[in-house]
Amino acid sequence: YLDFEDSSALGNDAAGSNNFTVNNLAAIDQSTDTCTNNFNVMNLADNIAESTFSEGSLKITTSSGNRALNTSSIGVISGKWYWEVKNLSPDGAANDEAFVFGAITKSPNTSGYDGSFAMTAGFGLRGNGKIWNGSGETAGWNSFTTNDIVSIAIDFDNGKAYFATNGSYGNSSNPSTGSNGYSFTVGSEFYRMAVNCMESGKSGVFEINFGGTQTFSISSGNTDGNGYGNFEYAVPTNYFSLNTKNLSEFG
């Protein structure tokens, strides 16, 4: 049988015979998302603005004619969760306000194609280095541009969020110690992770890493405290990748 444990030989037969020839697969295509432990992905059903989904619903390409907001399939209201987004957007110049990565409580369906309106039910880091909550901005965080990786660590137990660009957390914050995070109110509605293109005419391309399947190359290989996930940057202490086993324990 094929156990897919060796990323360099995904067609390897664990019994030692009848190996398969790998075609159009690379080490990055190995996934630890299984029937006994599902990792979070983006939700194809929430796609009013007609974004294109690929790479197992972990790569989002927005339509340049519409503003767009896409959310994840798993929602949470407690626990501490970590994920990463690589911004491949051709329009993703430094200090660009169009792109937002964060979490929301409401479906984008409630506001049609206008993702910026739906973000009033949540918060996220904009490309200009400010946290946007739909009605105002909080400065002091790090901006991001094309090919940058944004780390998002959200503490739903204490209502704090932390954002890093290429491993550097803004606002002198530290999610492991709980210092200088962005404060938000955790209510009774579940939050889902979100990527947002707030301006029509912009082209957003986002690769999302929840830990189970990689859409961009990982050079360092970091797991959470339970040994799950594969991330470019270190998972903060007591934060976890969003999968069903961790969810049953911490969510």
Map each language-model feature to its residues.
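PRY/SPRY (B30.2) beta-sandwich protein-interaction domains
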Residues: 1-251
